């Protein structure tokens, strides 16, 4: 069964992106990686507490501060988001989604062939995606 997650705001997604990239982090470390203009420390602290109530993160206490870590893997949330996008805007049709992006991005035949190759053989690395450390 697929997981269903609560809706995330843009700010919540930005904090999750930092946590997925960095791993367990303190609020001050997250602040340094958020796009400018950086929100206030208290704002980020509030966002991670909201993410905690939504079940996306948890924390370890270190004295009076907390180090936050993810509970929802990025790939799992990515799948959920894509399914929601497909269902809400493309009638659950992957071909409609690909057709839309092909038109929007003016993809040429070689790019479409590469996309089809990746769809047929998901183990082929995507040259545009950073390699994750083992």
List PLM regions with ranges.
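Hydrophobic residues on short alpha-helical segments
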Residues: 13-19, 98
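Short, hydrophobic-biased segments on the C-terminal half of alpha helices
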Residues: 45-49
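Short, cationic-aromatic polyanion-contact patches
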Residues: 5-11, 62-81
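Glycine-centered, phosphate/nucleic-acid-interacting loop/turn motifs that mediate DNA/RNA or nucleotide
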Residues: 55
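C-terminal regulatory/oligomerization modules of transcriptional regulators
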Residues: 103-134
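Short capping segments at the starts of secondary-structure elements
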Residues: 18-26
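Short acidic, hydrophobic short linear motifs in intrinsically disordered regions
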Residues: 25-34
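Conserved segment of winged-helix/HTH DNA-binding domains
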Residues: 73-98
